[in-house]
C-alpha cells in the first residue's frame, strides 16, 4: 500500500524565491477568512499530489546553489558561446585555399563557406530554445555538442564544396545551442540584481569570437592548412563537451520538479504525483506552443523586435568591416585592441539600457571617422581609432540589449527571447558582409560607411524610448507564452 510522500505543500513560487520571501507554512495560527455570513471558513488546502520545492531554501533550486557552482556553469556556457563564435571567422583566412582545392570560381560561393555557418545561428534556436524550456537545458547542451563535433569532423574531411556547405550550416545550427539557451541558464541561476556580470561574460563571446577568430585561423591555415582549422575546433569542442558532461547540472525549474516527481512516484508508488508546473497538455501541444514562442515574441513584442534589429545591425557591421581591412590596412602588420564591459545591478529591466543610451550613439561616429579617414588615406592609426569606437559602441549595445531581454522575460522565456534575438541578429552577420563589394565599389569607403552610420544613427533613439516607456510597453504588449 502506497504512503503519502513527504514533500512541500507550500506552493512557493519562483518569484518568491528570487525575492527571498519567507513564509511559515506550518503555522496553524494563521487567521482564517470569514464567509459572507460571518462564519469561519477553511482556506483551500494544497493538493497532496503536487510536487513543489521544499520551501524557499530548497538546495535543489538553482537560485540556492553555491556561488562557485553558479560561476562554474556560467563559465562553461560562456566558453562554449565563445568557441561557437570563434568558429564563425576562424576559417575565413583559409577560405581562399579551400576555393583553390575545390576549384570554386564564384566569390559568392566562397563567401558562403563562412556565412552559412552564421546563418545556422538563426535557424538552430527556433527549435533548440523551445526544446530547452520543455525538456531542460542540459540535454540540449549535450545534443548540440555531439552534433557540432560530428559535423565539424565532416567539414575537416569534406571532399567537395557541396558536402562542405551542408556540414557547415548544420554545424552552425548546433553551435547556436549555447547562444540561444545560455541566457536561460543565467536567468535560472541568478536573480535579476545579480545577473549583470554573468550576462556580460556570456554576451561577450559573440563579439570577441569573430575578432580573434581570423587571427588564430590565419596562423593555422598558413602553416598547416585550412583542414586543421576544423581539427583544432574539434579538439576545443571535445574538451568543452567533456567538461559540460562532467560538471554541469540541469537548471530548468520545471524539469527539475518533473524529475523530482518521477523519483517520488517510483519511491512511493503514487502515480498521481505531478510537478507543480506541469500543464494539462500533450507533448505535441507543448512542443508546438514552445516552437512558436520565439516567433510570437518577435512579432508581438516591440521590445524584442527593435532590440534585436539594433543588435543585429551592429553584429553584422563587425563582419562587414572585416572585408575592408585587407585594403585599408595592407601596410600594417599587427592590429591590437582590447574590450571590456561591466554591468551593474538593476532594480528594473529598463535600467540595463543606461549604457546603451549613452554609448550606442558613438557607433555611427566611429563609422564616419573610419570611412572618411580611410577614403582620404589619413595615417592608419586614425581609421584604427574609428574601428575601435565602432567596436566599443557595439559592445555596449549588444551586451545590455541581451541582458535587458533576459531580465524582461525572466527564466520562463529567456531562452525564447534570445532565440528571437538570434533569428534577427544572425542573418545580419551572415549576409551583411556580402553587400560590402557592391556598397564600397559604388560609394567608396567614405559614403559607404556613412550610409551604415546613418542606419545605426536611426536606431539610437531605441534605448531612450524603452528606458522611458519600456515597462508600459511590456505591460501593454504582453505575449501569451
Swiss-Prot record:
Disruption phenotype: Resulted in the down-regulation of the three biosynthetic genes from the trisetin cluster and a reduced accumulation of trichosetin.
Compartments reported by the entry: Cell membrane
Major location (coarse): membrane
Membrane topology, as annotated: Multi-pass membrane protein
Region (Disordered) location: 1-63
Signal sequence segment: none
Induction: Expression is induced by the final product trichosetin and not by the trichosetin cluster-specific transcription acticator TF22.
Protein name according to UniProt: Trichosetin biosynthesis cluster MFS transporter
Amino acid at each position: 500500500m502506497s504512503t503519502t510522500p513527504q514533500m512541500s505543500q507550500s506552493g512557493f513560487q519562483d518569484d518568491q524565491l528570487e525575492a527571498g520571501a519567507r513564509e511559515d507554512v506550518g503555522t496553524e495560527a494563521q487567521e482564517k477568512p470569514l464567509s459572507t455570513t460571518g462564519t469561519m471558513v477553511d482556506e483551500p488546502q494544497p493538493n497532496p499530489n503536487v510536487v513543489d520545492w521544499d520551501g524557499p531554501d530548497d538546495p535543489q533550486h538553482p537560485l540556492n546553489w553555491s556561488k562557485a557552482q553558479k560561476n562554474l556553469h556560467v563559465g562553461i556556457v560562456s566558453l562554449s558561446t565563445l568557441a561557437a563564435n570563434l568558429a564563425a571567422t576562424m576559417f575565413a583566412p583559409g577560405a581562399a585555399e579551400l576555393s583553390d582545392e575545390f576549384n570554386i570560381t564564384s566569390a559568392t560561393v566562397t563567401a558562403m563557406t563562412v556565412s552559412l555557418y552564421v546563418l545556422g545561428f538563426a535557424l538552430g534556436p527556433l527549435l533548440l530554445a523551445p526544446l530547452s524550456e520543455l525538456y531542460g537545458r542540459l540535454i540540449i547542451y549535450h545534443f548540440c555538442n555531439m552534433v557540432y563535433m560530428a559535423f565539424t569532423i565532416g567539414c575537416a574531411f569534406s571532399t567537395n564544396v557541396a558536402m562542405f556547405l551542408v556540414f557547415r550550416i548544420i554545424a552552425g545550427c548546433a553551435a547556436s545551442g549555447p547562444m540561444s539557451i545560455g541566457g536561460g541558464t543565467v536567468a535560472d541561476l541568478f536573480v535579476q540584481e545579480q545577473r549583470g556580470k554573468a550576462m556580460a561574460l556570456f554576451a561577450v563571446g559573440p563579439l570577441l569570437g569573430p575578432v580573434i577568430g581570423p587571427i588564430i585561423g590565419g596562423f593555422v591555415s598558413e602553416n598547416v592548412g585550412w583542414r586543421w582549422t576544423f581539427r583544432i575546433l574539434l579538439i576545443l569542442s571535445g574538451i568543452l563537451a567533456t567538461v559540460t558532461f562532467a560538471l554541469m547540472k540541469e537548471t530548468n525549474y520545471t524539469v527539475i520538479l518533473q524529475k523530482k516527481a518521477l523519483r517520488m512516484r517510483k519511491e512511493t508508488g503514487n502515480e498521481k504525483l505531478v510537478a507543480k508546473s506541469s500543464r494539462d497538455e500533450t507533448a505535441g501541444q507543448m512542443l508546438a506552443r514552445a516552437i512558436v514562442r520565439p516567433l510570437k515574441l518577435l512579432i508581438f513584442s516591440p521590445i524584442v523586435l527593435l532590440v534585436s534589429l539594433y543588435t543585429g545591425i551592429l553584429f553584422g557591421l563587425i563582419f562587414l568591416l572585416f572585408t575592408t581591412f585587407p585594403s585599408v590596412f595592407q601596410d600594417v602588420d599587427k592590429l591590437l585592441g582590447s574590450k571590456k564591459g561591466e554591468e551593474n545591478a538593476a532594480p528594473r529591466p529598463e535600467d540595463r539600457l543606461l549604457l546603451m543610451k549613452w554609448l550606442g550613439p558613438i557607433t555611427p561616429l566611429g563609422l564616419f571617422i573610419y570611412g572618411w579617414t580611410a577614403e582620404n588615406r589619413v595615417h592608419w592609426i586614425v581609421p584604427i581609432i574609428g574601428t575601435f569606437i565602432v567596436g566599443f559602441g557595439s559592445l555596449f549595445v549588444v551586451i545590455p540589449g541581451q541582458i535587458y531581454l533576459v531580465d524582461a522575460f525572466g527564466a520562463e522565456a529567456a531562452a525564447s527571447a534570445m532565440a528571437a534575438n538570434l533569428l534577427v541578429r544572425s542573418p545580419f552577420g551572415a549576409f551583411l558582409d556580402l553587400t560590402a563589394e557592391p556598397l564600397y565599389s559604388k560609394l567608396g569607403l567614405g559614403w559607404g560607411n556613412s550610409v551604415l552610420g546613418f542606419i545605426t544613427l536611426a536606431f539610437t533613439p531605441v534605448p531612450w524610448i524603452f528606458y522611458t516607456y519600456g515597462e508600459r510597453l511590456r505591460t501593454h504588449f504582453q505575449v501569451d507564452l
